[in-house]
């Protein structure tokens, strides 16, 4: 899944998942220069691990003023990753992240990447993941199901190896958003599911 966004203002602390393992990663492509004062992404290093104090103690990091006497921007151990146009930041979906002071112009593209499901357990995790982190999960109609039409229409077989499984799972989860339903196409793809 991925998106292009035009952010304004603050994005409070949150993880994009709680998988407890490296299952998904977010790749953010920045289009504007961002500093700690103008909306740079902030990370809490190590917070993706189940044994990190934030997770172990079930700390609400957005309550830092009451808990630690510091504003959200100064959560203990957090860092700001300042970026320039063209910079890429990649992090584990379980990592707590935020952005503060974003003003009215904070443009970025993101891609959420997961590993291919090879076992029934992996397939269950991918289904849970795509039920939330996908066009259907966000209730966004792309006109082509899981991916923007250009992503699929320009894909050679090497790229389709990576796209086929999420497309099939997304179509099962959100059949009314499937490309063949939206565009009246037939699909005779061989299943990529385990």
Give residue ranges: language-model regions:
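Non-heme Fe(II)/2-oxoglutarate
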Residues: 88, 94-194
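Non-heme Fe(II) oxygenase catalytic core, chiefly the N-lobe of the double-stranded beta-helix
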Residues: 1-85, 97-107, 111-128, 193-194
């Amino acid at each position: 899944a991925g998106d292009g966004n035009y952010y304004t203002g603050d994005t409070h602390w949150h993880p994009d998942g709680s998988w407890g393992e490296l299952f998904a990663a977010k790749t953010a492509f920045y289009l504007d220069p961002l500093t700690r004062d103008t909306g740079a992404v902030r990370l809490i290093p190590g917070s993706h691990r189940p044994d990190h104090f934030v997770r172990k103690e079930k700390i609400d990091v957005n309550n830092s003023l009451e808990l630690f006497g510091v504003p959200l921007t100064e959560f203990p151990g957090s860092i700001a990753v300042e970026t320039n146009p063209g910079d890429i930041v990649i992090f584990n979906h379980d990592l707590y992240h935020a952005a503060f002071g974003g003003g009215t112009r904070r443009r970025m593209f993101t891609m959420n990447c997961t590993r291919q499901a090879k076992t029934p357990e992996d397939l269950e995790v991918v289904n849970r993941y795509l039920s939330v982190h996908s066009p259907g999960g966000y209730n966004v109609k792309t006109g082509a199901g899981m991916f923007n039409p250009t992503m699929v229409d320009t894909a050679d077989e090497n790229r389709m190896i990576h796209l086929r499984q999420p497309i099939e799972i997304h179509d099962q989860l959100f059949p009314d958003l499937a490309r063949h339903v939206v565009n009246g196409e037939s699909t005779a793809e061989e299943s990529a599911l385990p």
